[in-house]
């Protein structure tokens, strides 16, 4: 999977992304609870797209959010939608970008299969978190539905969503996994950095 293909794919989808989005407040609330998104924490939002989770972070009174996406058009839309000193948008490849700062929480929401090197991504994100910080990979639908959807519409830019047990093993080098959940409603793997 080529990163330029990923950029092109999401740039094409960006203009209609929000129109096609289903924002389930109950699921997102549960995911953000698992992710430890609470008042005063700093958040690194990886593959933020058009800023889908920004209102939820701000409603929880986080200290600040750095939202990163590889797609320039996704970031452009996010910047138009949200401004303020608590949110900074960065158009970059999170695996190679020099993102200033270190964070309390890192969330990868509805995006993990689009990273061609999951082990490299986990390594990179571990380096962006404080000791005791939390990394959460989550999807607002089941693993089966994600993989079915990607096999039809995004096969060129998705490696598929691995099982929660396999992702927990990848996390294990840096994180103590305390949440590994995959059901008909959502997929969440989350752990605390040692």
Placement of each model-derived feature along the sequence:
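Short alpha-helix
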Residues: 158-174
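Conserved class I S-adenosyl-L-methionine
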Residues: 1-36, 40-49, 136-162
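Class I SAM-dependent methyltransferase SAM/SAH-binding core
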Residues: 50-96
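A short glycine-rich, Lys/Arg-flanked "PGG" loop and its adjoining helix->strand segment in the class I
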Residues: 120-131
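A conserved beta-strand element that flanks and buttresses the S-adenosyl-L-methionine
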Residues: 107
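Core SAM-dependent methyltransferase catalytic element
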Residues: 176, 181-194
């Amino acid at each position: 999977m080529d990163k330029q293909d990923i950029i092109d794919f999401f740039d094409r989808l960006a203009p209609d992304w929000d129109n096609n989005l289903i924002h389930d407040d109950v699921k997102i609330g549960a995911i953000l609870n698992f992710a430890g998104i609470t008042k005063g924490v700093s958040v690194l939002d990886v593959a933020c797209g058009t800023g889908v989770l920004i209102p939820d972070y701000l409603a929880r009174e986080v200290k600040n959010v750095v939202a990163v996406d590889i797609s320039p058009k996704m970031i452009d839309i996010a910047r138009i939608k949200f401004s303020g000193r608590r949110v900074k948008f960065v158009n970059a490849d999170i695996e190679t970008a020099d993102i200033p700062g270190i964070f309390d929480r890192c969330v990868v929401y509805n995006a993990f299969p689009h990273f061609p090197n999951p082990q490299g991504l986990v390594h990179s994100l571990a380096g962006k978190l404080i000791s005791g910080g939390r990394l959460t990979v989550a999807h607002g639908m089941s693993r089966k539905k994600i993989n079915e959807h990607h096999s039809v519409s995004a096969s060129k830019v998705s490696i598929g969503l691995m099982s929660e047990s396999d992702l927990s093993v990848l996390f294990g080098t840096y994180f103590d996994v305390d949440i590994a959940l995959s059901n008909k409603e959502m997929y969440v793997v989350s752990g605390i950095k040692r």
